[in-house]
Regions:
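Terminal targeting signals and extreme-terminal segments of soluble enzymes
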Residues: 1-289
Length: 289
């Protein structure tokens, strides 16, 4: 396991500070505020620590309420809403400076047999010969703002390999579809829950920007105000975040300064292991035009 991946695993392993209360460290990825994927992964970690191991998370639905401060820790308060015969429900509130910055509900279930079907995995080129996002970024290092360059070019705990690379500094309108392979930069412990925390963390990368593709816009442009508003994630079974996963994303709609994006995550065997949806703010700031 690389040092940056070890740091991420530690980030998602929260400190219990009281019954139903947990504290997590923060990381600065060079964004203007706390990365939403961190809060998603840590919220799931907090909820999972209040549920028996035999019940596995199958869904999480959350709202981003305020920008988080990447320089401060986050406190997670868990409400044990219900433990039923098959399902457990938890409500989690992420708090900074005494204010909620994120809230979500997560549902857990015992494994059981039932009807099964899934959509087929898209026929997409494999990841082996594709350049990573980091390699593509290094090729354009001179275009990255100097105050963000070190953060953008440092080693990453998760390797993303886009199937079709686009130029974030010279975007052109294109179809609102994106395919990206990803996996952690190294092997993970044999702890299924940690693989799901990392899936939640990774699911917030690249999804929102899919809704910008038809408009020839990126998050790097000064005339764009972009932020995640909500996030939903469904787990369809166990997954391995340290083996290649295909993130197939599209955006069927945008309007009223909001973009809606959805994603399907497949393993190399073609199994659908997770589904994602998100609505985000994609506001054109006319004062910069």
């Amino acid at each position: 396991m690389s040092q940056v991946l070890d740091d991420l695993v530690a980030l998602l392993s929260l400190e219990p500070i009281e019954e139903n209360l947990f504290r997590g460290r923060s990381q600065d990825l060079g964004f203007r505020q706390l990365f939403g994927g961190q809060v998603l992964g840590q919220s799931l970690s907090a909820a999972s620590q209040t549920v028996e191991d035999a019940r596995h998370v199958h869904s999480l639905h959350g709202y981003f309420l305020r920008p988080g401060d990447a320089g401060l820790p986050v406190v997670y308060q868990v409400d044990r809403v219900r433990d039923g015969g098959s399902f457990s429900t938890r409500r989690v509130t992420a708090i900074q400076k005494g204010q909620p910055i994120f809230t979500c509900s997560a549902s857990f279930q015992y494994d059981e047999q039932g009807f099964e079907h899934q959509t087929s995995m898209p026929q997409i080129v494999g990841p082996e010969n594709l350049p990573s996002e980091l390699e593509l970024m290094q090729q354009r290092a001179h275009l990255i703002p100097e105050n963000m360059r070190d953060k953008m070019l440092c080693p990453k705990p998760i390797e993303f390999r886009p199937v079709t690379a686009s130029d974030p500094y010279n975007p052109q309108p294109t179809e609102a579809v994106k395919y990206i392979w990803f996996r952690t930069d190294g092997s993970l412990p044999e702890v299924p829950a940690m693989h799901k925390y990392l899936m939640a963390y990774a699911s917030d990368f690249n999804l929102l920007t899919t809704s910008l593709l038809p408009h020839g816009k990126t998050v790097w442009q000064k005339d764009m105000q972009v932020a995640s508003l909500d996030h939903s994630l469904w787990f369809h079974g166990d997954l391995r975040a340290d083996d290649w996963l295909l993130y197939a994303m599209d955006s069927p709609w945008a309007g009223n300064s909001r973009g809606f994006s959805r994603g399907s995550v497949y393993n190399r065997a073609g199994q659908l292991v997770a589904s994602v949806s998100q609505e985000g703010l994609i506001r054109h700031r006319k004062d910069w035009a």
